[in-house]
């Protein structure tokens, strides 16, 4: 089974719409980095996505380092700063798609964004 995880920072003030746009950026950009075999398998299974949260930029960077060690494709999203946050603010991280087993080793302890 395959999935994609998007992780959002909750320590910065973002409206629901802003969070939606940042998760969309993360999902699309990360999926473009996937190899064809993984992308095709993920699409065939219905493109499962899970949205999780962290409390800081540091927490996102720790996840990036774990992705690098496990060779999982990812996309770290920095906002342009035109609306709600300062330019260059890191808002979200798209992880995968990849196997659930691999991604769970990186994000398995994180809470859902509600």
Report the location of each language-model feature.
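Generic structural signal for well-ordered, non-membrane alpha-helical segments
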Residues: 16, 20-24, 60, 99, ...
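Glycine- and Gly-Pro-enriched alpha-helical subdomains that act as flexible
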Residues: 4-5, 9-34
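Alpha/propeptide regions of enzymes that mature by internal proteolysis
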Residues: 59-64, 72
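Compact, glycine-rich, soluble single-domain proteins
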Residues: 24, 32-33, 37-58, 69
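Short basic, glycine-rich beta-strand/loop surfaces that mediate nucleic-acid
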Residues: 6-7, 45-55, 68-114
């Amino acid at each position: 089974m395959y999935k994609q995880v998007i992780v959002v920072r909750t320590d910065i003030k973002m409206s629901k719409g802003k969070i939606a746009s940042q998760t969309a950026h993360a999902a699309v950009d990360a999926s473009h980095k996937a190899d064809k075999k993984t992308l095709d398998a993920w699409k065939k299974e219905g493109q499962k996505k899970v949205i999780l949260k962290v409390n800081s930029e540091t927490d996102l960077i720790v996840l990036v380092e774990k992705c690098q060690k496990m060779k999982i494709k990812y996309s770290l999203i920095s906002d342009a700063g035109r609306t709600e946050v300062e330019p260059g603010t890191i808002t979200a991280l798209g992880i995968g798609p990849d196997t659930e087993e691999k991604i769970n080793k990186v994000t398995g302890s994180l809470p859902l964004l509600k």
